[in-house]
Amino acid sequence: SKMNKFIEENGFDTISILHNSSYDFDGFSVCGSRGWFFDSDEEHNEKVLNREVMRLKASIESAKNEEKIVFLHYPPVYENQNCKEILNLLKEKGIKKCYYGHLHGMAAKYAFDDNFEGIDFKLISADRLKFVPLLIKKF
């Protein structure tokens, strides 16, 4: 991919990109995708959503550990809306923790940081965390 080529050409040897893949650690796997929030009938949005669901599915299915932690850019749950396609996949695959970004500033006050249908969701955008990294899990 373009990103992997850029990383390699610039000698960034501590950065890896999730792309239809996962990273396996001792006892858990990190999975993810950009995700999407489908709230329109536009054909383009449906196409992007379907592609992102397939990417996330590939990422989760590539994981070797039972515990899988998912990271998304877009929130699958926001205010009184949710992205049922992403949520259904997370439930189908037994995901218990999902971290997401995208929401900044005033939009972050509407973030969903709670359990929804058996999955714990948490907004981890940099400004929400006051630019202090959040320890997800020690390994």
Q: Which residue stretches match the model-derived regions?
A:
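Conserved beta-strand scaffold positions in the cores of enzyme catalytic domains, especially
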Residues: I17, V30, C98, F121-L123
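Binuclear metal-dependent phosphoesterase catalytic core
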Residues: D24, K47, N88-G94, M106-F139
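Conserved catalytic scaffold of divalent metal-dependent phosphoesterases
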Residues: K2-E85, L89, K138
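Intrinsically disordered, low-complexity segments enriched in polar/charged residues with Gly/Pro
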Residues: I7-N10, Y99-Y100, L123
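The start of beta-strands in P-loop NTPase/AAA+ ATPase cores
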Residues: K68, K96-K97
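A cross-family glycoside hydrolase active-site/sugar-binding cleft signature
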Residues: F71-H73, G101, I124
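Short amphipathic alpha-helical surface micro-motifs
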Residues: F12-I15, H102-G105, G118
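Active-site environment of divalent metal-dependent phosphoester hydrolases
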Residues: S1-K2, S22-D24, F38-D41, P75-Q81, ...
